[in-house]
């Protein structure tokens, strides 16, 4: 397992260094790479991984806590770290999947102003004006910190390499901008997604089912489950293990809640997204 500090936000260097160490420890070809990322530079971390392990599937998520206030830590090789990136190289038969299960609504607009993970304008209008119009709710009702829970069932979706990914609006600001857990950039087309609580639960089974197709006989499951989805599920998150057992049988399971997930919906192209399920099945 490799680990590297994300110094000065240099995710590329951290991803490259940690992946090199993990592959060296494995001593052979990796079937998959399992991430425990640091929230913020995930897209750059994935670029660093791809530089040393092109085409190797990536599965995992970013370390989380009870709230996104920077207290979360990463762990690797018997130690805990802060502001680090950890990655494990795994050999043997594996299957993997990266899904979210949101339905497209057809309500979409082009990003006209954005910086980093903050969206300012959609179609030349305040981002929150467009979003509240789409969901038919007042900004006074769902704005500010309330957005993080409301938007779990109504995220904004982006399309890349023919796949639809989810971005989580986690906060809105007085100027009408919206903060996300994934990068925003001018020219992106964002579309409103939607899902019921029942749908969020069922999608966990779907993700593991898709991952299990990659192996003959599943022997273990690792699921990086979005912490934001857990907010919407509440106590019903306890239904997830039964959903997985119904899907693939009584297979040992390890799961964790992540603040942002990494995975490969397209072979060899790792992507960072939010409100997602990143599943790894060992064969």
Question: PLM features: residue spans?
Answer:
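Small-residue-enriched flexible segments
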Residues: 1-234, 238-251, 256-283
């Amino acid at each position: 397992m490799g680990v590297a500090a994300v110094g000065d936000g240099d995710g590329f260097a951290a991803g490259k260094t940690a992946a090199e160490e993990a592959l060296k420890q494995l001593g052979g070809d990796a079937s998959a790479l399992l991430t425990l990322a640091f929230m913020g530079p995930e897209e750059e971390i994935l670029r660093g991984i791809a530089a040393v392990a092109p085409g190797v599937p990536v599965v995992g998520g970013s370390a989380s806590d009870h709230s996104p206030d920077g207290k979360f830590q990463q762990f690797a090789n018997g130690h805990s770290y802060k502001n680090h990136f950890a990655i494990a190289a795994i050999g043997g038969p594996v299957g993997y999947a990266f899904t979210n299960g949101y339905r497209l609504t057809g309500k979409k607009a082009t990003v006209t102003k954005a910086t980093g993970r903050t969206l300012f304008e959609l179609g030349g209008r305040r981002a929150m004006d467009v979003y509240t119009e789409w969901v038919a709710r007042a900004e006074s009702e769902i704005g500010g910190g309330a957005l993080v829970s409301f938007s779990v069932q109504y995220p904004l979706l982006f399309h890349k390499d023919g796949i639809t990914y989810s971005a989580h609006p986690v906060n809105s600001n007085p100027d009408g901008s919206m903060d996300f857990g994934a990068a925003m950039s001018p020219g992106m087309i964002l579309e409103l997604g939607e899902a019921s609580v029942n749908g969020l639960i069922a999608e966990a089974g779907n993700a593991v089912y898709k991952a299990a197709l990659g192996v003959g006989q599943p022997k273990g499951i690792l699921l990086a489950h979005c912490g934001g989805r857990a907010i919407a599920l509440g106590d019903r998150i306890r239904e997830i293990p039964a959903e997985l057992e119904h899907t693939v049988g009584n297979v040992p399971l390890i799961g964790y809640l992540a603040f942002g997930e990494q995975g490969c919906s397209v072979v060899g192209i790792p992507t960072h997204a939010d409100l997602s399920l990143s599943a790894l099945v060992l064969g």
